Structures are given as C-alpha cells and as structure tokens.
C-alpha cells in the first residue's frame, strides 16, 4: 500500500509529504521518484537530485536489512518516509519496525554511512525500542 498525504504544518509553512510503502526493495523506486520530484521543486541541480536519490536508496536499504519481516497484528510491514520541504532544504526521515529490539544499524564508520555523509548535508539515525529511523537533510546552496 502506498499512501501520500501533503499538508501544511505549523506557522512556518513547511510542506510535509508522508509516504508509506511495503518494506521491500521492490518499492524503493517509489521513494527515489518522490525524492527526485520534491528536490526538483526546490530547484536542486540534477547532480544534487541524483545525490539525494542515492542517499535515500542507501538509507532505505540499511533499514530494510534490519526491518521486521513479519507483520504485527496482521498489517503489512511498512517502510515510512516523511519528506519535509522548506524554502531551502529537503529533509527525508525514513523508519521501519525492527525485527527485534536488539537490531542495530551499521556502525558510523561503515561504508554505508560514509556514502550517506558524502551525499547529504546532515545525517542522523535513531533506534528506539521497536523502530529504527534515518534522517537526511540536503540544503540548497545559497
């Protein structure tokens, strides 16, 4: 299931787009396409758009590696993506339910993290109970 919601949030006027797809590599193209479309709205260069697409793909692949493979309560396991569009930046926050509370993302020195750090201006990760998330921010050059 894919769900897209666009809304204005708060007084700052940031646009927020929420997208949830089945936690499967087959659906990463949907997230890459959404990323490219939103980055184009901010007038990122073609190289910057491609960098963001690759970064989102890598972040999602890292999350899928530790995602739960069986749904809880009969629902489909989902990879959720929250895009926040400001005047000068795009922030992408992707989350998945964990296979177990002991699951961890790769170490910060890993090749995957080096790729993310090179492609995005800010990168952070959270593992909270039964959910893991990666946040990427790319700013438009002034």
Language-model-derived ranges and their functions:
Residues 1-18, 62-142:
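Conserved beta-strand-loop-beta-strand hairpin that lines the nucleotide-binding pocket
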């Amino acid at each position: 299931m894919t769900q897209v919601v666009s809304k204005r949030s708060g007084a700052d006027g940031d646009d927020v787009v929420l997208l949830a797809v089945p936690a499967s590599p087959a659906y990463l193209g949907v997230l890459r396409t959404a990323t490219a479309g939103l980055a184009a709205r901010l007038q990122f260069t073609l190289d910057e758009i491609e960098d963001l697409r690759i970064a989102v793909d890598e972040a999602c692949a890292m999350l899928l590696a530790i995602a739960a493979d069986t749904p809880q309560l009969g629902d489909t396991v989902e990879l959720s993506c929250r895009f926040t569009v400001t005047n000068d930046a795009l922030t992408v926050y992707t989350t998945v339910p964990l296979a177990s509370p002991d699951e961890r993302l790769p170490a910060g020195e890993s090749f995957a993290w080096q790729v993310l750090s090179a492609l995005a201006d800010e990168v952070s990760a959270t593992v909270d109970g039964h959910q893991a998330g990666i946040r990427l921010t790319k700013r438009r050059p002034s």
